[in-house]
Amino acid sequence: MNVSKPEQRTLHALAQGGHIAFFRDASGKVTQVECYNRDGHLLLDCTLAVFARLKSKRLIHSSQGRPYRISMAGLKAVRPQADNR
């Protein structure tokens, strides 16, 4: 599956335990997203457009109104990266 660099960075942060917090307007449409890694730092590559592409490809999912997490399809699509921890 073709995954762009910003999508790849976002998926990698989610695969390590991060989440995507979302904010809705009065009509229920998602208007703003913030991607956090497992340490609580904000990832700037995660924009509303990246969020929409990941959601349309079903690489992320949310259940019961909780923050978005990586799905099993997302785990298979993410390429391994070196972790400099």
From Swiss-Prot:
Pfam families: YjhX_toxin (PF09857). Belongs to the UPF0386 family. It comes from the Bacteria. This is UPF0386 protein PSPA7_4799. NCBIfam families: PRK13687.1 (NF010240).
